[in-house]
């Protein structure tokens, strides 16, 4: 009766601890710290299955070899011994055991067993005191999913999965910051030339698609975290009275976060598409005006060059024509001056008049 009262009191304390989260509905942003903290706690260990002031049983999945059960108890009057039994009362040999005494002479016991195959639940940890001839027991029910290979592989990668996820997020943020810095400052030149080559290769549509993919890749990773967490959460069962309430609360929070992320992602895409269309429409008239102005300037420059060439050619032609006439008249004048059949006279008045 005393143990039952203590167990009910511990369950009431757990429910009182999480009850304020169910009564008042706050903004979704305030749940994010608890949301990620719960995930980290579940990554570290599965919460305690059975607790009391005397006996405590913990369930852990250290690797893919099996399920590890730990039973601890303190403040015992020596001598005392701890044993594990299955549902049929058969003794399960323990893997490790540890005992110690404090200054008051009270005994502290700790024992663990490694279950590689599914056993018939419940599993009982009992402590028998030889002096008082009394026995204390605590039982725990193991779900079948704990012995499935999918759950064991997921729990064995409990540190690699979050670290890989965080590494990808940090790498993408750092890469984006470096590219933005290089675009703004123009240094180093290698990155600037690389970006210019990429822009030259890609056309307008492909460039817009790459921009959208780059901007919303992090949002997609954030949204993809929720199904991963829910998949893990559904496998890591917590067998206590507050488990249904806790699971429903997490489901509601995940649904709210998913709806908000999808809504704001769609809104951002729509605004970006609208701005892109407006920018193209405003760019076409300015481009046509620039082209017409450029054609006019080019035609005017060509006409001025043609006029200059025409004037130069006319001047050259007139100059050569005058030189030709002057040379002809000079030759005729020389022939008339040195004709031996005529008297010596010079009559070049016509040449001077011309």
From Swiss-Prot:
Residues the record marks as carrying a glycan: 129
Kindly name one Pfam family recorded for this protein.
Answer: C2-set_3
Keywords per UniProt: Disulfide bond, Glycoprotein, Immunoglobulin domain, Membrane, Signal, Transmembrane, Transmembrane helix
**Residue ranges annotated as Extracellular topological domain:** 53-158, 231-252
What tissue specificity is annotated for this entry?
Answer: Expressed in skin and thymus.
Q: Name one GO cellular component term.
A: membrane
Membrane topology category: Multi-pass membrane protein
Disulfide bond sites? 71-125
Q: Which residues lie on this side of the membrane: Cytoplasmic?
A: 180-209, 274-354
Question: Where is this protein localized, as stated in its record?
Answer: Membrane
Functional note: May act by engaging a cell surface molecule on immature T-cells in the embryonic thymus.
Protein known as = Selection and upkeep of intraepithelial T-cells protein 10
Q: Which gene encodes it?
A: Skint10
């Amino acid at each position: 009766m005393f143990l039952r009262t203590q167990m009910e009191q511990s369950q009431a304390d757990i429910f009182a601890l999480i009850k304020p989260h169910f009564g008042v509905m706050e903004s979704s942003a305030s749940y994010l710290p608890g949301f990620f903290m719960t995930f980290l706690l579940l990554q570290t260990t599965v919460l305690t299955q059975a607790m009391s002031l005397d006996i405590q049983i913990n369930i852990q999945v250290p690797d893919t070899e099996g399920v590890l059960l730990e039973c601890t108890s303190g403040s015992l009057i020596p001598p005392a011994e701890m044993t594990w039994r299955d549902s049929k009362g058969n003794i399960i040999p323990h893997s490790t055991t540890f005992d110690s005494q404090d200054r008051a002479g009270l005994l502290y016991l700790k024992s663990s067993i490694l279950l590689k195959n599914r056993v018939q639940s419940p599993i009982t940890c009992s402590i028998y005191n030889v002096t008082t001839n009394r026995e204390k027991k605590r039982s725990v029910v193991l779900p079948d999913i704990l012995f499935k290979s999918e759950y064991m592989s997921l729990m064995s990668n409990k540190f690699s999965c979050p670290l890989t996820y965080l590494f990808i997020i940090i790498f993408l943020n750092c890469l984006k910051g470096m590219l933005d810095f290089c675009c703004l400052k123009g240094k180093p030149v290698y990155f600037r030339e690389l970006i210019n080559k990429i822009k030259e290769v890609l056309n307008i549509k492909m460039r817009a698609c790459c921009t959208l993919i780059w901007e919303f890749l992090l949002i997609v990773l954030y949204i993809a975290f929720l199904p991963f967490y829910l998949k893990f959460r559904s496998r890591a069962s917590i067998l206590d009275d507050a488990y249904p309430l806790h699971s429903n609360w997490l489901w509601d929070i995940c649904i709210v976060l998913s709806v908000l992320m999808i809504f704001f992602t769609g809104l951002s895409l729509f605004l970006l598409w609208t701005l892109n269309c407006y920018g193209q429409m405003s760019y076409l008239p300015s481009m046509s005006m620039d082209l017409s102005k450029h054609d006019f300037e080019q035609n005017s420059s060509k006409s001025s060059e043609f006029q200059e060439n025409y004037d130069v050619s006319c001047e050259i032609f007139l100059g050569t024509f005058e030189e030709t006439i002057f040379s002809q008249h000079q030759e005729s004048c020389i022939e008339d001056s040195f004709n031996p059949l005529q008297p010596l006279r010079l009559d070049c008045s016509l040449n001077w008049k011309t």
